[in-house]
């Protein structure tokens, strides 16, 4: 057991991967800007919920959004797989943060939160390795967290009410914390309405089985997929579902739905804990650094998201990683 978790340090600085990542990020930039423009345009004209009920009219728009997003993820992943200097890290931040801020303006808060947390984790895991005192860590966390929490709450008020409610700091912080627990109602709702919900196959694997049929919230989505969040929202309030509203989902409910048992929850969380521990102990391995953005995104979204939401992104990145290694070896490009 101890040998299994023994960290296998293999730190290297592959200039080839860093260059690939940087150029792919630049290549994705026009498409990402276009996607942000379309997103902001939809929100301004039709409101935040239009993101969940409307789809681009042109197939070209879908292709641009799909390709640019994949190039962005691949580029960032290759870039962070090498040993970044502080200068390289700031380049990464200057590229990723403005994109996340643009999504924040459209009402999507999660992208900015995940980006900031990932950058902080990466900085202290690979750039600044010296220990920091608890007091400094606590103070820094508060200085970062409080403004972001207030900003997120203002965005939430704006997308729900059209403007900020002008409440004081304490009220806004309290509202922010209260909203973080909203996904806690998903499991009670599931238990109450489980006999009204379809169970063609486990909700846990819906992101894998139904990925190609994922789309706007509509009757077709309910007919062709088995997403827990969509099915549960439709059972609670079908009209609200069609308007783009949703109760969300959580991996705990996905696990519980397998046999409607606490055992499945504990088993799933135990296995997930092992996977996270393995990742943390071996994070210096090049491939795990390469996958770290997706890993952190998955972990941070788990309380309010699906366990396998990024399944195909992981598969794509793993395939591309091995293809890139084969290409390097064929060109005699040394690590």
Model-derived features with residue positions:
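Hydrophobic alpha-helical membrane-embedded or membrane-associated segments
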Residues: 1, 23-30, 140-148, 313, ...
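Membrane-embedded catalytic interface detector for glycan/lipid assembly enzymes
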Residues: 3-135, 144-161, 232-238, 242, ...
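Structural motif marking the loop-to-transmembrane transition
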Residues: 16, 60, 64, 86-93, ...
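Enrichment for repetitive, rod-forming helical segments
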Residues: 42, 69, 77, 116, ...
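Small-residue-enriched transmembrane helix-hairpin modules in multi-pass membrane proteins
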Residues: 51-60, 149-272
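Hydrophobic, Leu/Ile/Phe/Ala-enriched alpha-helical segments that form helix-helix packing faces
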Residues: 80-84, 212, 216, 275-279, ...
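Central hydrophobic cores of alpha-helical transmembrane segments
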Residues: 91-101, 138-144, 269-273, 289-299
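Hydrophobic alpha-helical segments
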Residues: 244-335
